Amino acid sequence: MQRRNKPEVLAPAGNLRGLKTAVDYGADAVYCGGKSFGMRSAPKNLSLEDFEEGARYAHERGARVYVTFNVLPRNNEVEAMREYLGKLKDTGVDALIVSDIGVMLMAKQVAPNLELHVSTQAGVTNYQAANAFYELGARRVVLAREMDLQAVRDIRARIPDDLDIECFVHGAMCMAFSGRCLFSNYLTGRDGNHGECAQPCRWKYSIVEEKRPGQYFPIEQTAEGAYLFNSQDMNMLAHIDDLLDSGATSLKIEGRSKSAYYIAAMTNAYKTAVNEYMVQRGFEDADGNVLKPFRDRVIRPGDPEYGKPDTEDAIMANADGAFAGKPDIDAVPVGGVPSGNVSAGNVSSGNIAIGEPDNLSYHARSTRRKSNTAAEILPEGWHHAGVRPAPHVTLPDWLLDEPDKVAHRDYSTGFYYPEHKVRQSTDRSAYFRAWLVVGEVLSWSPEDGGRVTIMSRNKIEAGQEVEFVLPGAAPFAYTVPAGGFRDADGHWVEAINNPAHVFSMPCPQEVPVNAAIRSRTKKPTLKAE
């Protein structure tokens, strides 16, 4: 029996504020690092007191907190890890994310109350490894980012139901295998395996001829230069049905070093998408009431349906269903198949040739799917033998636009679709940003038809179109009227033009505290968020 009754949206946090923001915007769980032994040293990270407060805040709202404990320790760090773990176990957090087997066994001894989640750093790429970690006490594996959907499905079909599968769905990708990289350490002495990555893969490089030392020849692909090792970002928002249908139980958003706005916007987007999945798949009604138990749609060995085709009516009625990943299990034709297991090979039935189609690109999807995946379908009469066909989960336009409203590099769908893998993004390394945060809500009052008090971040002027990012809903779009700005002392001002100052302005709709206010930039930039 599966442990979860709903897919988990797992959000990042680099500090206590980020943790609370993630919970406020719908995260089922938040992962964050302490002051030591996590894979991100750039963010402020959380103290033991922060973990106590954060865990209490999350639990009161039905969410969980996971702590990254996934460095690859050296001998001189082992006892310090043991001591830190002894303190961490009493803070109320729910799980540890580990990558080292020794640390995993230490955690079982020192902190048996904490769940163990195996980090992507461990490089789990097959069901044998997943089962081995399960036997060692893990209750979740974070699969290597290099896995395609069929590999996820095959692992899900061959591991215990109470072993969670966590998969990355959004954010930065690494040019090294699941983040295990020596590049930064080699060039700068900053150890990426201890959270200190200098990201030299994002740098621009020049060529130096052996006999002309000191003469640098730039490598230029565009006016921006050339970035030889730079990878695209991941964006699976329009494809989460494929991932959940493949057996993932937790959807992980990358970004512990990102802003509170990024955390809010992306957590809200993926939570809304999961809610749509649950309703459109018939697991819940629109009010969140359970209609039937949630389970993945993977067909396991031993299942009566394993390897058997559905009827033609059932298949063709759902012709844009979840055909994701080049199958290890053969595709099978709709009709004319003898009883029992049939290996797709050189048999034919009627006018249908039974054999692997020449081009399994596995998608007939809405044109609103934004990434580098193909919009193709299996040849007529075929369906994937390893997954039950179902209609594609449709998402509203506003939701599909959300990933473009945070700072990002060129998007891809990672390695999930074999024919359309993540690529180098060699023409630029900086983030693209078409929207910027102009303020954060401090309070709202019904005074004078509604007024919002904000902490300013960027200029707001009369006639400007802004959006309030709302938890569990589409953003509230609003054109700022003239003549309504006041400063903190109540004096009327023509515009909000001083960052980090308190102002108020008209706002007819009630908006929650800490909601981000964003606006289109007048000129899209490549400035990092």
Task: Enumerate the predicted regions with their spans.
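Glycine-rich, positively charged N-terminal anion/phosphate-binding segment
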Residues: R40-H59
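Glycine-rich loop at the start of a catalytic domain that most often binds anionic cofactors/ligands
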Residues: P43-L48, N76-L85
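Conserved phosphotransfer cores of two-component systems
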Residues: A111
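Alpha-helix capping/helix-boundary segments
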Residues: G102-V103
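Gly/Gly-Pro- and Ser/Thr-rich, intrinsically disordered tail segments characteristic of DNA damage-repair
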Residues: E79, V118-T125
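Surface-exposed amphipathic alpha-helical tracts and adjacent flexible/coil segments at the periphery
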Residues: M1-D24, A29-Y31, S36, A55, ...
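Phosphodiester-processing cores and adjacent nucleic acid-binding clamps
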Residues: E52, V65-T68, M81-Y84, V98-S99
